[in-house]
A protein has these predicted regions:
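Glycine-biased strand-turn-strand hairpin within the trypsin-fold
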Residues: 26-43, 47-103, 111-113, 124, ...
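Conserved catalytic-core segment of clan PA serine endopeptidases
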Residues: 97-98, 117-147, 156-160, 173, ...
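Cleft-lining beta-strand/loop regions that shape enzyme active-site pockets
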Residues: 152-158, 166-169, 211-214, 382
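C-terminal recognition in membrane/secretory proteostasis and scaffolding
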Residues: 2-7, 22-32, 39-44, 93, ...
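Short, conserved catalytic or interaction motifs in soluble domains
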Residues: 57, 99, 146, 173, ...
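Active-site loop architecture of trypsin-fold serine endopeptidases
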Residues: 28-29, 34, 41, 63-65, ...
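Short glycine/Trp-rich loop-beta-loop segment that forms part of the substrate-binding cleft
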Residues: 102, 124, 157-178, 258
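Bacterial N-terminal signal peptides
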Residues: 9-19
Length: 467
């Protein structure tokens, strides 16, 4: 190489190295002022925090004074034995999702409340009325009692767009200390084995969520609402870095029903009983791993039957979204709007096929429902005849016979004895129960002894009570 070319090449190398060293030194030096480096969530918080509110619920509960059972006490004070009432208060959070004053919160925050008040970030307080509550998703929608005021509100973001590792902020009122903001990342986007609501599909985050945060907002870095904070996993009662939020796409469904004036949430139903895929089933189907939702049975005259679904079909996706287990299917299907159709990807006899299923609302069974009012173990339970749609909704064998408990009044004898939504009553005092009127008639007999047989979670159990 000629001397002048070697000199030019060497000069270029020296200049390049100097530039690298200068850049490296510049990157590693300590910033000379706070203006050079500013990492803050303040702009997002300032925009979204005014839409996060505190929710105060008050309910009257019956209490019995143990001294009233003492005959000497009653004789001395001239008071009959009995019970009194006291006010029980609970505190949670909520999110304004409409400038007109609609607030979404957790159902467990306001369950059984006789009075609900909402406190805004600017310290204003309003009474709130119940618009809709949905125990299945643990969501409720309130409306502030105002005179045409306009409120700050959050917009929904697409919770399906979240990815593990995304940064999120949790905003609420933990331990009643006042509005608090914590940050973290998305730890999981489809946590299904949580056991909180009927729809087992949650966003998991390590953002600190504590008692009082229930019903608060989980927002992304654009300020969009991606979830409603609902629960924590904790052995101490405080945050341990495992919090769960209901995805915004499920919240949308509940809010849409509230805006349309409905008192219940309208969701599509399939009409098929699903089961998880075990390692043994996966091996028999030739799958590499357990995944999907296996159809165990199909109800007659259901959307599933009309679509041609069969027992043994394996649902692997809904509109292209992968299905890992029956809980994931329930969530994906429940967040579809009524009307139109959904395309299910199936494995049938070792081949992949696609089937279109109509998105139909669950048939109204309200005319079959009644509340047991007679003094009995069932007092306060709302019961219904078991229909294919209700069996699908509660994951009960559609071929079963009996009367199902669809709701239990807060503080009722039925709740005190542990009856739950989804319990299938088979017999009472050796009398078979097949219709709601059967159970109503038996409950009115006011027996001193009760022998009750129910099915819960697929397991038959019996209980004996004296009263």
């Amino acid at each position: 190489m000629p001397f002048h070319l070697r000199s030019l090449f060497l000069a270029i190398l020296i200049s390049f190295a100097t530039a690298l060293l200068g850049a490296s030194a510049q990157e590693r030096r300590v910033p000379s002022s706070s203006n050079e480096v500013r990492l803050s969530y303040a702009p997002i918080v300032q925009r979204v925090a005014p839409a996060v509110v505190n929710v105060y619920a008050a309910r009257m509960i019956a209490v019995r004074n143990p001294f009233f059972d003492d005959p000497i006490f009653r004789r001395f004070f001239g008071m009959p034995g009995g019970s009194g009432e006291q006010v029980q208060r609970s505190l949670g959070s909520g999110v304004l999702i409409d400038p007109a004053g609609l607030v979404v919160t957790n159902n467990h925050v306001i369950e059984g409340a006789d009075q609900v008040k909402v406190s805004l970030a600017d310290k204003r307080e309003f009474e709130a009325e119940m618009v809709l509550k949905d125990s299945r998703s643990d969501l409720a929608v309130l409306r502030l009692k105002t005179h045409r005021e306009s409120f700050p509100a959050l917009e929904f973001a697409d919770s399906d767009a979240l990815e593990v590792g995304d940064i999120v902020l949790a905003i609420g009122n933990p331990f009643a200390v006042g509005q608090t903001v914590t940050h973290g990342i998305v730890s999981a986007v489809a946590r299904t084995q949580v056991g909180i609501t009927d729809y087992q599909f949650f966003i998991q985050t390590d953002a600190a969520i504590n008692p009082g945060n229930s019903g608060g907002a989980l927002v992304d870095m654009t300020g969009g609402l991606v979830g409603i904070n609902t629960a924590i996993f904790s052995r101490s009662g405080g945050s341990q870095g495992i919090g769960f939020a209901i995805p915004a796409n499920m919240v949308r469904v509940v809010v849409a029903s509230a805006r349309s004036g409905g008192s219940v949430v309208k969701r599509p139903w399939l009409g098929a009983r699903l089961q998880a895929v075990s390692p043994e089933i996966a091996e028999s189907l030739g799958l590499k791993r357990p995944a999907g939702a296996l159809i165990a049975s199909v109800s007659t005259a259901s959307p599933a039957a009309r679509a041609g679904l069969k027992s043994g079909d394996l649902i692997i996706n809904v509109d292209g979204q992968t299905i890992e287990d029956p809980n994931a299917f329930d969530y994906r299907f429940a967040t579809k709007p009524i009307g139109g159709s959904a395309r299910l990807g199936l494995m049938r006899a070792g081949k992949e096929i696609a089937v279109s299923v109509a998105l139909e609302a669950v048939p109204d069974a309200s005319h079959d429902e009644l509340v047991i009012a007679s003094p009995s173990p069932f007092q306060g339970a709302k019961i219904s005849n078991l229909s294919p749609a209700l069996a699908d909704d509660l994951r009960i064998d559609p071929g079963a016979q009996g009367v199902v408990i669809v709701d239990v009044a807060n503080g009722s004898p039925a709740q005190g004895l542990g009856f739950q939504r989804g319990d299938l009553v088979l017999s009472v005092n050796n009398a078979k129960v097949t219709k709601t009127r059967d159970l109503e008639r038996i409950a009115a007999q006011q027996s001193r002894f009760w022998r009750i047989t129910i099915v819960r979670g697929g397991q038959q159990m019996s209980m004996e009570l004296r009263g």
